[in-house]
Amino acid sequence: MNPSITLADVQAAAHRLSGHVLETPCVESRTLGRIVGARVFLKFENLQFTASFKERGALNKLARLAESGAPVGGVIAASAGNHAQGLAHHARRLGLRAVIVMPEHAPTVKVERTRSFGAQVILHGQTFDEAHAHALRTAAEWRPEVVLLDI
């Protein structure tokens, strides 16, 4: 957890996301609560368009870029799957080019879903770290049109 994140930061993010992602239900799990001896709540982020909470972080990052006023022609990121889909979906919705670098052995379903959301997918490296390093190199070559998003 980043200790420099304030309540105001969380409230600003909630405002940015409002109307663009689903307000998913939060339900108490009595079974898990009994196991751990505390109240446990489950947030059903699987109901999001991309079926993942990662969509929230991707959209918040894109919205913050838009707020900055800096010209952004596209975004590039490294991801093994869920972040890629959220970024691709919201970049397309905002009219931005999205390039996602994924490890060569990323699950086919994640690669294809990312492409279906309009992103260009580059498969590179055996590990996430290798894909991330390639994304950094690619971003350095494409600047200033592409901004690296690293979540």
Task: Put a short name on every predicted segment.
Residues M1-I151:
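PLP-dependent amino-acid enzyme catalytic core
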